[in-house]
Amino acid sequence: MMATTEQHPTLERATFKHSVNILIVVAPYYKDIAEQLVEGAKAEIEASGATWEVTDVPGALEVPTAIAIAHCHTNFDGYVALGCVIRGETTHYDTVCNDSSRALQLLGLQGVCLGNGILTVENSSQAEARADVDGQNKGGGAAAAALHLIKLKQKWSKPTGKIGFLSQVENKLV
């Protein structure tokens, strides 16, 4: 089955007043695909004025674990998960796709700003179409998602202007 070229609406590119640093975590099992995904992610991050660092992990199942470790022990503002899983002859494909996606979603629900660019496809042609920087550019899309979540987190994390003492009467910040 061919990948469609249908266009979807996109949000305006996120930009930042202060420095933003992104960790790109990539499973380079399919090296050519991974390189395209990383290229797209780097370009989007740089276009937003942010900086990036790349780290490799053995496979798609290790991507969420690496992000969780980095989130606990570093000061990255957000994360981009990249990799590719192509269906094979066994059910391993389903396990890797479902578990990596679920783990990334759980991280997001805990407030980790991340974009999921782990491709889950039937064949290499689909992967190439989605990874191509001049095509569907899913690496760039995953980076854009992470950047938008960082922007949203910054918006909702603004100081209220109050000094932080609790009123004993109302039990509210004053």
Question: Across the structure, where does each feature detected by a protein language model lie?
Answer:
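SAM-dependent methyltransferases
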Residues: M1-N21, K158-V174
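Short, ordered loop/turn segments at secondary-structure junctions
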Residues: P28-Y29, V57-A60, C84-V85, I118-S124
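Generic secondary-structure signature for well-ordered alpha-helical cores
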Residues: K31, E46-A50, A68-C72, Q105, ...
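Phosphate-binding/catalytic loops
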Residues: E122-Q136, S167
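Short, acidic/small-residue loops that bind anionic groups at enzyme active sites
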Residues: D94-V121, S125
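Glycine-rich phosphate/diphosphate-binding loop of Rossmann-like nucleotide-binding domains
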Residues: L11-V57
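A charged, well-structured terminal subsegment
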Residues: Q136-V169
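N-terminal small/polar loop signature for handling phosphorylated ligands or for N-terminal nucleophile
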Residues: T55-A81, R87-T91, T95, Q105-Q110
